């Protein structure tokens, strides 16, 4: 039976503060810090899904050279998610190279899909920013459609 996911709300601070994501991909390792103070709901959601193994084995289903790579859809088509949606959080940063943000289908439709910016881009503030790549931008640049996230874990942020 397929696992049922439900939105966790904001997790306790000790589960989301000073955390980073370590993602093993077909092309190598990507590490990104999480902005728990700016986007606690979104960080809680990403931590919850990651700890549950949601992202393990999923692919990057969308790559726009010079713009973004996108993943987090269990269907691999850009239409799937965890089975729930949650509200946007105010965007407090520009969409610069390495920024990690939620992909959505309109206001308050966040789920599991996320994207990583390949270059600084002036986007409207419609996509909740919740992290930034700290290691592996060379790997991000090599990601192509179909590349796999083989392992995604949450860990204490490197000092």
What role is predicted for each listed range?
Residues 1-159:
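Cyclophilin-like peptidyl-prolyl cis-trans isomerases
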